[in-house]
A protein has these predicted regions:
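Flexible loop/turn segments at secondary-structure boundaries
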Residues: 18, 80-81, 111, 182-183, ...
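PRPP-dependent phosphoribosyltransferase catalytic core
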Residues: 156, 171-172, 189, 207-213, ...
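Amphipathic alpha-helical
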Residues: 137-146, 288, 300-318
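Short, glycine/charge-rich flexible loops or terminal/linker lids adjacent to PRPP-binding catalytic cores
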Residues: 303-348, 362, 386-396
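Secondary-structure transition/capping motifs at alpha-helix termini
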Residues: 124, 145, 278-281, 300-307, ...
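Extended, hydrophobic alpha-helical segments in both membrane/secreted and soluble proteins
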Residues: 284, 291-298, 302, 306, ...
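A conserved beta-strand->alpha-helix junction
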Residues: 59, 128, 133, 306-317, ...
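Conserved short alpha-helical segments that host acidic/polar catalytic motifs at enzyme active sites
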Residues: 1-216, 221-281, 287, 375
């Protein structure tokens, strides 16, 4: 329903680096379904393959055999900056003074337009509309007088916004997370080799051990001398501002994100929601899959029957993964189908994780009405999304957001439901352990990194 920007994976010094990167990306396919790529490095240099499509469609056995080397980084992408085209697929590779540098990025750099203009005035040439390329230019410039870790740190000091980077060059792999820690990055261990991933579900698939989260503002350097951790230079915020939508929607429920168990958080959100507002209905039902875990918590707290009265077609991609509105509407129609026998004459409470634009909810409620539902009540396990996100989530203007454009009674009328209740911000924060460490800007407009005059970075190349 809502698109995220990407997922990262990296592994250092392992016999089967490319294949492990493949499965690490496969486990994080939910974070990006437009393109996928892997870069490996050996004594002969870098080897890469990237293309549009899902991980199993992009990589074959033949391709993986060609990606030789014991160190790899990988990327799955959804376009939040730059268009959905081959040239924007990552990882990026740059060549500088006989040195190859590969970059994979998760996030959104809010001052990228300003930095790009500065770089272009100094003669830089850009091939994509991607904010990640801005960082690559800064990195290469710093490499003129610094080694790779120092250059990464210097380049990061110019950035504002959200970023997790994996940077690979020769025998050095650098992992870095922005000082606010907007998006997750985890460190694990497989057969003694360090492994990095956006989500820990990648470690589970590989039977790697999860060690810890990469901390906000931390840079981890892995090279032939071992592993070294340091803090990025410059001032750091007193508290992180981690994206709570990772817990509400994006992350897989079997992942640990920001040192929180996603499954437990979502059940707690449902539990808190039921405490706030439980309608008189025959049963609780989720919209699979993202609403399932909140609905379980809601039903348990409310002591009401829980039914799977919506069946998902698992062979249809996420509604918002395709970038055109016509494809989005098609996805809404075919992705989920109600069980007719469960709907007619029933008073139903639908529990879902969020309403952003409202397109999906309107279509599904209409279908329930057509099948004879007596009452349809909606309970949402997050607060109303009223403000755009500048840090890498696909709602970049208030005009897209139904809660920003309509009052509650207007939303009820537009959705054609009998009642609607969103989880309060207080209820949301009671559902997590580290309640003072989250970005809530999409709910309350309190932006940690201002993006004045910028409805999210949009440097579309005219050639894209």
């Amino acid at each position: 329903m809502i698109r995220h920007e990407c997922g990262l994976f990296g592994i250092y010094d392992h016999d089967d680096a490319a294949r492990l990167a493949y499965f690490g990306l496969y486990a994080q396919q939910h974070r990006g379904q437009e393109s996928a790529g892997i870069v490996t490095v050996d004594k002969d240099g870098m080897h890469d393959h990237k293309s549009m499509g899902l991980v199993p469609d992009v990589f074959s056995e033949e391709v993986l055999r060609r990606l030789t080397g014991r160190t790899a980084i990988g990327h799955v992408r959804y376009s939040t900056t730059g268009s959905a085209s081959q040239r924007n697929a990552q990882p990026f590779i740059a060549h500088f003074k006989g040195q190859d540098i590969a970059l994979a990025h998760n996030g959104n750099i809010v001052n990228a337009a300003e930095l790009r203009a500065e770089l272009e005035n100094e003669g830089a040439i850009f091939a994509t509309g991607n904010d990640s390329e801005v960082f690559m230019h800064l990195l290469v410039r710093s490499l003129r007088h610094k080694d790779l870790p120092e250059a990464v740190a210097e380049a990061c000091s110019r950035l504002k916004g959200a970023y997790c980077f994996l940077v690979l060059s020769g025998s050095t792999l650098v992992a870095v997370r922005d000082p606010y820690g907007f998006h997750p990055l985890a460190l694990g261990r497989l057969d003694g080799s360090p492994v990095f991933a956006s989500e820990t579900c990648a470690f589970d698939l590989l039977e790697a051990d999860y060690e810890r989260a990469v901390e906000p503002g931390e840079m981890i350097v892995v090279d032939t001398l071992g592993e070294h951790s340091s803090r990025l230079p410059g001032p750091h915020p007193a508290k992180p501002r981690q994206c709570i939508f990772e817990l509400v929607y994006f992350a897989r429920p079997d992942s640990y994100v920001f040192n929180e168990q996603v499954y437990v958080c979502r059940k707690q959100m449902g539990w808190q929601l039921a405490h706030e507002s439980t309608p008189d209905v025959d049963f609780i039902m989720p919209f699979p899959d993202s609403g399932v875990y909140s609905a379980v918590g809601f039903a348990q707290c409310a002591e009401l029957p829980y039914e799977h009265a919506m069946i998902r077609n698992h062979y249809v991609g996420r509604t918002f993964i395709q970038p055109t509105q016509s494809m989005r509407n098609f996805g809404v129609r075919v992705k989920i189908n109600p069980v007719r026998a469960m709907i007619e004459g029933k008073r139903i409470c639908i529990v879902d994780d969020s309403i952003v634009r409202g397109t999906t909810m309107m279509t599904r409620v209409k279908k329930l009405r057509e099948l004879g539902a007596k009452e349809v009540h909606i309970r949402i396990s997050s607060p109303p999304v009223k403000f755009p996100c500048h840090y890498g989530v696909d709602f970049s203007s208030r005009g897209e957001l139904i809660a920003a454009q309509c009052k509650m009674d207007e939303i009820v009328k537009r959705l054609d439901v009998d009642s609607l209740h969103y989880l309060s911000i207080d209820g949301l924060l009671r559902s997590v352990m580290h309640s003072d460490s989250f970005c809530l800007a999409c709910f309350n407009g309190d932006y940690a990194v201002p993006c004045e005059g910028c409805a999210k970075f949009s440097l579309e190349c005219k050639r894209s």
